[in-house]
Amino acid sequence: MGTVVYQQGFQSQLNEPRALRLRLSSPNPHFSQPFGLALKSHLLDSSHAEDTRNRNDDKAAASPVSDSSGWSSLQSLSSGSSSSTKTTTSSEKESSYYVQRPSSCRALSDQSLALCTENLGSESGSDVTDIDELFSLDVQTKNLGETTTETRTLKSRKRSVSPSDLPPPLTTMRGFQCIQMRPHRENGRLVMTATNAPPRNGCFQADRSNGRLRLSILKDSNEFVENEEETIEPEETEEYEEEEEEEEDEDEDEVMGIENVQVSRRCVQGDRENRGLLNWESFCVATS
């Protein structure tokens, strides 16, 4: 007997090698065996050969199916990859189109179009300006300039007024010496100190009496006025005399009154000496 072994080269490595076993009768018959046993063995061999053939046919039929399934799986994978690439390319195209659309195609609203075509007077001739509007604009600009200058002058005046002049210097109960209050800060507190004010050539003097503030004319005011009159040039004095003569001629019917001015000044406290009445010199007042 002999055995034949063969292996399919075109199949995949997963398939195991297949072997066929055939039993062949020897050319020299053995007459020692009975004829019935020989027939039985021949029948068994033939049946076994048929079974093996059927198995081979089934496996051969199954192999293309397996090959086709393998090819189909590979094709499905390739088709899936191709479809995925197609979907990605299509999505990229859509996204790029969606992104580029606003930059390339922008829809203008009615307001924007109106703004664009509002001042195209060279084409339609509708851009006409009124003279009244131009003058009104000029007036507005002038008013703004005046207001700005006024505000600047007010600020400069506020800066020029020194806060040290307020409150004005006042006289004391003991004498005519003027005292002025000076504020200053010390350790986070406001401290008011009384300082002697420098003498001023003023016509009025401030003093307190009976809980009130009174202004009185200084004694040296007439001398101060006389000194100022002496400094006037002679030409100005002549013109001044001529004007006085003309006024006297016109005011002949007017009456000249003489008034005596007396100011009473007393101390509030009784322990101190009372101040006497001050007799002021009389002066003339002309009324027209």
From Swiss-Prot:
It comes from the Eukaryota. Residues 48-60 have a biased composition (Basic and acidic residues). Disruption phenotype: No visible phenotype; due to the redundancy with other FAF genes. Residues 48-100, 146-172, 222-261 are annotated as: Disordered. Residues 165-217 form the FAF domain. Expressed in the shoot apex, stamens, young leaves and young siliques, but not in old leaves. Detected in provascular and vascular tissue, but not in the vegetative meristem. In inflorescences, restricted to the vasculature and absent from young flowers, except from anthers. InterPro entries: FAF, FAF_dom. Residues 66-90 have a biased composition (Low complexity). Residues 223-256 have a biased composition (Acidic residues). Belongs to the fantastic four family. Able to repress WUS when constitutively overexpressed, but have no effect on CLV3. This is Protein FANTASTIC FOUR 3. It comes from Arabidopsis thaliana. The gene is FAF3.
